[in-house]
Amino acid sequence: MNKSSFLFFSLLKKFFQSSIIIYFLILGSLAYGDNHIIKSHGISTFGELKYNSDFQHLDYVNPNAPKGGEVSIWAFGSFDSMHPYTTKGRSGSLSSIFFESLLTGTSDEIGSAYGLVAKSMEYPKDRSWVIFNMRPEAKFSDNTPLTAEDVMFSYKLLQEKGLPSFRAVIEKEIDTVEILGKHKIKFTFKKGIPTRDLPASAGSLPIFSKNYYVKSGADFEASTLTP
């Protein structure tokens, strides 16, 4: 083998070695992209969130508005219940405002949801599951802590005794729910369905106090005028 041939084969060998390295680097980056976990203070169906993680108030809210007074709301028809999550009775207008959720929407965006009871959330690019990191300072009106146990309790309550619309959504969308810590809970969604809206859907479920229902023995399915 002459010197020219030797140099040619040496260069060819180095080329193939470099190509193999680049190939595996590309595969690694693709795998990272597929499995990359997004951590955020909210989630949007369309594009980017309007508000960043340290926003102090919504643009349409006056942070210096006077506190106190009363609000009068009109609505068609009548009501005999302040429990909007049971089939019994006709619930009053705005009766759902007494219940909070992990996420909440805004009035100046479409398809965006931000942490309310949840401080932050984690989910993969394909949105096949979501983890909610809850605010440890969150409490119910009776001053009892609001924890992942309450979220799990609420999920099961809605699944077994909630409105048919809630049961249908849960049955169609949610595969499993796991408590990962006192203030951390994971929703895994069913395969074979569009996942774009599922993290926000799971985060919108109302949260009920497990302590209240266990201690009082209250019937979740009963109509009541007690908020």
List each model region and its residues.
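N-terminal lobe/hinge region of extracytoplasmic solute-binding protein
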Residues: 34-126, 133, 156, 223-227
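N-terminal secretory signal peptides that target proteins for export/translocation
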Residues: 1-14
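Aromatic- and charge-enriched surface segment that lines or borders ligand/interaction sites
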Residues: 61, 87-94, 120-164, 178-180, ...
